[in-house]
Amino acid sequence: MLGLVAGTCVGYLVQADRDPTPLTSLSQVTLTQAKGEAPEPLSAAQDRRVRTDGDLRKLLLKKPKGAKEADWLEGADGWMDLADYAADYDEPGNMFGSFLGSEFRRAAVTGWLAGDSSVEIRLVQYRQEETVAASEAAENGHYWAEREDGTESYPVPGTGDGMAYVHTKPFVELGGVSAYSARAFAWRGDIAMEIWVYDSKRISKQLIVDLAKRQMEQL
């Protein structure tokens, strides 16, 4: 054992007394720089994000020819802030906090009156940094619509899980007038779509499904 230790020490001393052996140089990989100009950014038609990060109001369906502008919409100039959006619910204070937690970003709204039929469309955008709130908002709409008696449901083509609902039983408005309603909910990316239709007569499946389909095609 002693001889092994001594031999190791001698070998170490000899090695320590030598000049260090120079290492061979490392070969450097030369990266070739791409020549020419950078590619052009995608247009709004090519990149959905370009559209949805712009003026959300431009993605709303246009008022049909002959229809009147809605004068009952919340918000101003086609925009709804968080307070405006929450104010449309039964418990605005609680809903304000709920939507704040859902990372509400902004909402665009439009509407019109055609004869006895009124239409309101909302595009609600979420930040979605912590949660997929747009899909959850659509699911919430489905839940409440399906709870009503006399409700017929129809898929919205091209949306995956988007649904339109026709309520076959009238409800009584504050003025004592009976009215029928239909609604639709769908989502794409960070935007949830809501459509509400009211009329003095039962609303057709074709009307609500067509509105929802065309609006989702804008997104």
Please tell me what each predicted stretch does:
Residues 173-219:
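Extracytoplasmic/luminal low-complexity segments enriched in Pro/Gly and acidic/polar residues
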Residues 1-2:
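N-terminal export and membrane-targeting signals
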Residues 18, 129-131, 203:
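Residue-level signal for secondary-structure boundary sites
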Residues 111-112, 138-146, 215-219:
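Hydrophobic, Leu/Ile/Phe/Ala-enriched alpha-helical segments that form helix-helix packing faces
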Residues 130, 134-182:
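Short Gly/Thr-rich strand-loop-strand
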Residues 106-135:
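A short acidic-to-branched-hydrophobic micro-motif
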Residues 7-107:
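N-terminal "mature-domain start" segment
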Residues 123-127, 138, 197-199, 212:
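A mature extracytoplasmic/lumenal domain signature
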